[in-house]
C-alpha cells in the first residue's frame, strides 16, 4: 500500500493494514478511527516523511522514544523488511553504535520487562515484554554493530531483504538493494561468501522464500545447491530451530519440497528423503510415499485453518485433492469441539512448542517406517505391516539427533505409533471400552492422533474418498473427542474405585496379578459395566472365583 498521502501524520491500521483513521495527533487519530470502525482492533502508526513513507508503529517505537538515544540506533533486519511488506512484526531488532546490553537493561527497567544478556562478547541484550495489542511476549534485541559502520554491518547479513535499516525517523538505509529485491520477490545473498560465513543460512534461504512466497535469485540458488553438504557442519540445535520455523510456515509442504529440490532434505531429514523411493499401491492416491507425506502435512494445515475459522481449504490444493464435500463434513464434525480443540492445540508440550506445531511433525514422520517394512504380496500389492511402530523408533532416533526435548519426542513418537488406530476401527461404532483403550495407549497425544488420522485419510484417498467411509471416520473421531472433552472421568481416566490394599482385603495375593486386576477393573468401569465400589468388589470377587475354578 502507498502511504505517501499520509506522510507526517498518524494513521490507524486494521489487521490487514488498511487505513481506518488519520490525524495529526495520536488522540485525534484514535477518535477518527473509533468513529469509522468501532468494533475493529486497530493499531496506530506514524507515517515517515521520507520515501518510502513507512508507517512506524506506535508500539513499541513511541513507547521507546524517550528511552533511546537520538543518534547511533537503527531498526534493522527482519522488522524493516516486514514494515516494507506491511506484515505484522513479532520481534524487534535494533542495531546500536555502542552499549547494547546497557541499553537493553535500561529499556527493560523502564518497561518493567525481563532482561537477558544474549551475547556479552558482542554486547547484545534482549528485552522480553508483552505486546499490549496481542498480549503475547515480544522480544526487543539491542546489538552493537558488527563492523565499524552500519553499512558494513548490513553487508555482513544473510540476504539483501534482511540487510536494510531504518532510523527512528523513518529514513531507509539500503546498501545492498534489499528494497528492489522485495519488489522483485527475490531472496538474494548479500555477498558470495554468505553461505560459507554461516551455513545455517542455507536452510533459512529456503524457509524465507517459502514463508514470503519469494523465489531464490539464480546465483543464490546455484551457491545453495553447490554448498548444500555444508549444512552438516551446523549444530543440531540450529538445524532443529530452522526446521521448526519451516514447519510453522504455510504451506510447509512446499518448503519441504524445496529442501528436497536443492539437496538439503537428505542431509537434515534423511528419513523423509528416503520416502521418495518408496512406492505404494492402491488405495493410496499417491504412489510415491514422500508425496503422500507432504499431502498429510498439507491436510493437517487445512484442519488447523478450519478450526481457526479461516478460509476453508478446497479440492484444488496442490497436495490434498480431497473433495470439497469432505471438508464441509469435517467442518461440521469439528464445530462442536472447536473451542476445546483450539485450546488443546495451543497448549505447549515444551517451551515454545505447542501441540499444533508437533502435530505437523507427526504428519511429517507418520510413514517413515514404510522404508523398512515394505513388502510385495503375491497379488503385486505393496504392504507395510508394522510400519507405525517401526516408524516411531526411527522418529525417536531422528528427533534425539536434532536435540528435541524429551516431552516433545514422546508426543511426536506417539502420534507416529498410533496414527493407524482410527483407520483400523472405522467400520464399527466406537465403544466406550475402545475409547478407553485408545487414550490409555495414546495419553495426552490422543486428540492429536485423531486429527492426524483424519489428515492421513484425506492424503491416502484424495479424490477417491467416499462419503460412507468419511462419515464413519468422522463418527468415531467425534466419539473420541466427546470422551476426552466431555466425559473424561467416565471414559478416559475414571477415578479408581479400589486400590491395592482393597484387593488384598478381598483375598488377592500381592504380585503382578494385582496390577492386571486393577487395569481390568478400570476398563470395566470405563465401559460402564461397573459404577460403584460395591460393583467393583463383586467384580473382583467373581474374578477370583473364576480363577480358582
Regions inferred by a protein language model and the residue ranges of each:
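A short, exposed loop/beta-hairpin motif centered on an aromatic-Gly-Thr core
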Residues: 16-25
